[in-house]
Regions:
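Intrinsic-disorder/low-complexity regions
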Residues: 38, 57-59, 89, 202-204, ...
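Alpha-helical scaffold segments in carbohydrate-active enzymes
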Residues: 2-10, 41, 48-51, 55, ...
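Non-catalytic C-terminal accessory modules of carbohydrate-active enzymes
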Residues: 124-134, 139-142, 153, 169, ...
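Extended glycan-interaction surfaces of carbohydrate-active proteins
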Residues: 2-34, 74-159, 192-224, 242-244, ...
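Residue-level preference for long, well-ordered alpha-helices that form the structural scaffold
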Residues: 31, 38, 58-61, 65, ...
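Compositionally biased regions
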Residues: 17, 22-23, 63, 321, ...
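Structural helix-adjacent loops and short alpha-helical linkers that scaffold large soluble proteins
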Residues: 1, 51-70, 112-126, 171-184, ...
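Well-ordered alpha-helical segments within folded domains of soluble proteins
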Residues: 35-51, 100-112, 157-173, 232-245
Length: 330
């Protein structure tokens, strides 16, 4: 953090970094001097450094980085938020907002920078087909931009699984669980279609990037090798993590030995033999003759919080062995 402060922090409190630092190699972000994603990432770093200070009971460390976090947050909100577009945008060297909406504008959600009103306005773009609400969520460039391509063309419209993970985790920060689940399911459909295409002449694969409004991998005329196949770097995020955390709805904390389950609707689902710090657990919802019930099995004690349809919420200690609970009795 100190090195970043010394080399990239400017007098206005924001950070200036090369656009290449975002890895968005052909994104139309010309003249960017203050990238919104880099500054949001710095806020995230400061936030977690402060949290580590709390864990270590180091009050000076915690206060130092908490102050830095709020300093960055204030500057991002005051300088990088566009009231007309309801979007966070990059700045040029003169601190003018650049008129391009990219996926980088959603990094502030993950950093918990916008207030509830700004977050709601920003999140509306994710359901707007004219901007980021494409069939396959979420394109790396707004669909109303002149550089947007239905074929993806790198960061001119392609859907990158690793960017989707960032956006979906940002939605969680503001309790948009239903939208996060819906977008996860849609994203997983396109991942699965790319892995098992309907056309038998095609070989399936896990790709680096996908098309925004149709099935299949993205393409780029000037770079035939794009997107890379066998791209396992982000495959786990798009498949395993989103399935467990957003489709099923489980939030797991190994240090606290806790499992939170947000059940969006009553249906048969769950997970078997999930590792919880040397403790294999099984959690399943099923409908029996007695009604909807949750069946659980565990090797050791852990704490289970269940939130059903945002109407019932309860935390219970779950002992080792097998047990079940009727949802109506909670």
């Amino acid at each position: 953090m100190n090195w970043l402060e010394e080399n990239y922090k400017q007098e206005n409190g924001l950070y200036s970094a090369p656009c290449a630092s975002s890895t968005m190699f052909n994104s139309p972000r010309e003249n960017v001097f203050y990238p919104i994603d880099f500054n949001s990432a710095m806020a995230i770093n400061a936030s977690y450094m402060s949290a580590l200070g709390d864990i270590l009971n180091d009050k000076d460390l915690s206060f130092k980085y908490k102050r830095l976090y709020f300093s960055i947050k204030t500057r991002i909100n005051s300088l990088m938020w566009n009231n007309e577009e309801n979007f966070y945008q990059d700045l040029d060297k003169d601190q003018n907002k650049l008129p391009v909406k990219t996926i980088a504008g959603f990094w502030p959600l993950l950093a918990e920078i916008p207030n509830a009103d700004k977050a709601a306005s920003l999140i509306e773009h994710l359901s707007n087909p004219k901007t980021f609400g494409t069939e396959h969520p979420f394109p790396t460039l707004s669909a109303d931009d002149t550089h947007f391509s239905e074929n993806g063309e790198g960061f001119c419209g392609s859907v990158f699984p690793i960017m989707n993970f960032m956006v979906i985790k940002g939605l969680e920060k503001y309790q948009y669980y239903e939208l996060a689940r819906e977008c996860s399911i849609r994203h997983l459909y396109f991942i699965l279609e790319g892995l098992m295409p309907n056309e038998q002449k095609q070989n399936g694969d896990l790709y680096e990037a996908y098309c925004p409004n149709k099935e299949g991998k993205a393409t780029m005329a000037s770079l035939p090798d794009f997107p890379r196949g066998h791209f396992l770097i982000s495959a786990g995020l798009s498949t395993i993590a989103l399935m467990i955390e957003n489709v099923i709805g489980l939030s797991i904390s190994l240090p606290r030995k806790t499992v939170d389950w947000i059940i969006p609707n009553l249906e048969i689902m769950g997970i078997e033999n999930l590792s919880l710090k040397r403790n294999l657990i099984t959690i399943l919802s099923n409908k029996s003759s007695r009604g909807w019930e949750i069946q659980m099995e565990s090797e050791k004690l852990y704490y289970f919080t269940i939130n059903i349809l945002d109407q019932k919420k309860k935390t219970l200690p779950i002992p080792s062995g097998k047990c079940s609970m009727l949802i109506d009795k909670l």
